[in-house]
């Protein structure tokens, strides 16, 4: 989520 935050990494994508």
Swiss-Prot record:
Please name the GO terms of the biological process aspect recorded for this protein, alphabetically. Answer: neuropeptide signaling pathway
- Span-the-membrane segments of this chain are none
* Positions carrying Phenylalanine amide: 4
Q: What cystine linkages occur within this chain?
A: none
Subcellular location(s) of the protein: Secreted
Q: Tell me the keywords, alphabetical order.
A: Amidation, Neuropeptide, Secreted
Q: Which GO terms describe its cellular component?
A: extracellular region
**What job does this protein perform?**
Myoactive; cardioexcitatory substance. Pharmacological activities include augmentation, induction, and regularization of cardiac contraction.
Stated family: Belongs to the FARP (FMRFamide related peptide) family.
Q: What name has this protein been given in UniProt?
A: FMRFamide
